[in-house]
């Protein structure tokens, strides 16, 4: 694997198969075959395959088989994506290539930057997030020639609102058991390929990356009076799996181009700067020459028709993965108070936190007058995800569950010790019994994504992540729950956007999932199942 992306960089990484099992698609060329007649394949002096007609000796170059990111999404040969595909189609080299071709194809370059990536870069360069924002705008706009740069805060808030509304609606219609978030593409791919029984539980709300991409391309195209496919959107994200998310096919093909053309991580951005020192740099001179407020800076690099500019660079309460579990409960509280103000008063609500078996799983409970109203859980890391999925697996009523005798004896021993000491059972988080679960594949969540910059060799990685988390927490917060009018404003603007720019709401806000069928060819199974 490359120096940028390796198994060591990805927590709980499950190695892909040793070879791709995707079958080669043979095109139907009956008319050409009748002209060529019988053919044979030969290799020329340059090692390239040729198709040679036995009738007249005419030759034709053969196209090599290619694997795309979309192919990876539709294949069950690997649980995670092939690294070569990620590097080939979403890499800093591809961005450099696209920038070089800008003069001939007149592409318009725009970028969006996630909160976690900003925090990671600020930690790596030992500066404040506000300063790294200034340097990133200078790099992208002044040095690379990008037309617009925005934060993903607006897309995230629309995602949070849509997610919460969706969960509330499904629960009010009697949905039983937990609804699972879909913001983490690594977790979603894992579910599609190995645990299809949970797909009906997964929310169909799009991530901030994809919502931001749809907004940015549509607004830019309208303002500059160009087609969407003339716009090249770079998204800077904390995770390599975000590259795969950008390649997911849309259910609604009305918008012709992908919402995101290239995803780079902070690691890859630093590599680009190292390899192109003569052209690009996060130059500290830009700070000394940067007068004016951050608000002015954010306004200057956003499309003129981009709403809530400062909001796009603001953060949200809750976890460093976006706060989906926390915001669901806060927005549910607001919903209950608005729906039935006689029964629910805001001052009588409180939020309780319950720890799990480890620091990567915990539960939040919304309590009203000592009665639990709803709950959400935060589950990070594949080990915790696997435990949750196992609990959610349907069991046949005709089969009896066998208890491991060792486990039974251990439970009895612990119970006996508690009885002898007079200690009470301590509550422990159980995500399988919550209303909603925020799931992220990486331990510690997105702040510790596989694409985030690692600690220097002389510094502890856990301490480094803690420093990154501190910088993430320094980003100004605008809570949806603290201002109910903001939520209503955003919902109204979203509806107007969809009408004015002819974008279906489902195209902007919704995604879809499907079971990836296992291969039936025995040779493919043999090759693709070696882990």
UniProtKB/Swiss-Prot annotation:
GO terms for molecular function: 4 iron, 4 sulfur cluster binding; iron-sulfur cluster binding; metal ion binding. GO terms for biological process: iron-sulfur cluster assembly. [4Fe-4S] cluster 1 binds at residues 20, 72, 75, 78. Keywords: 4Fe-4S, Iron, Iron-sulfur, Metal-binding. One of its GO terms (cellular component) is membrane. Residues 395-426 are annotated as: Disordered. Pfam families: Fe_hyd_lg_C. InterPro entries: Cytosolic_Fe-S_CAF (IPR050340), Fe_hydrogenase (IPR009016), Fe_hydrogenase_lsu_C (IPR004108). Transmembrane segments: none annotated. The keyword Signal does not apply. The keyword Metal-binding applies. [4Fe-4S] cluster 2 binds at residues 184, 239, 442, 446. PANTHER family: NITRATE, FORMATE, IRON DEHYDROGENASE. Component of the cytosolic Fe/S protein assembly machinery. Required for maturation of extramitochondrial Fe/S proteins. May play a role in the transfer of pre-assembled Fe/S clusters to target apoproteins. Belongs to the NARF family. This is Cytosolic Fe-S cluster assembly factor NAR1. It comes from Meyerozyma guilliermondii (strain ATCC 6260 / CBS 566 / DSM 6381 / JCM 1539 / NBRC 10279 / NRRL Y-324).
